[in-house]
Amino acid sequence: MSGEVRKELLGVVFFGLFIFLGVSLISYSPFDVSFHTVSSRPTQNLCGKVGSYTADLIFQIFGIMGFLIAFFFLFLSFLYIRKREITQKAPFFSGVGLFFLSASILLQSILGEVDVKGVRMFFSGLLGFVLKDGLERLFGQFGSLFISSLFLFISLFFLLQAPIIEAIEKRFKRRRPVER
């Protein structure tokens, strides 16, 4: 199998994961059978019991931020279907992880608990709550927000793999009308 075909196939697999996770998360019901719920009623999740267990696990660990995981698979699918490649994988995936964790802490600090189909849960799941709580114990509320904001900004350097200020300046320079 050639490298081009392999990339397309991988792109289709990532797109399938996006669809499965997206539908599982959208049709999630906290009352479906799952790791911590016993139920005799029929599963409401459109992806069946596997979707129910998957969505419950993602919501418990990552909360609403779990939707970013699905969209990450969508991003990877477009990348591979268009036969592009991430040239520097380590910085890119480090940036993705740092972005996800810092955004989880920030959003958990700001939004706290949310109501999901009649059940209260942490916006960023157990992971976001534990990280936010740990940072707040060490640095206080302002320090936690500052540090997570700083890490969010740093993650953009890893993701874009280019100087951010320079990229912003180039973007604005192109949009200015030509002076006569």
Language-model segments: which ranges?
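Alpha-helical transmembrane segments used as membrane anchors
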Residues: 1-180
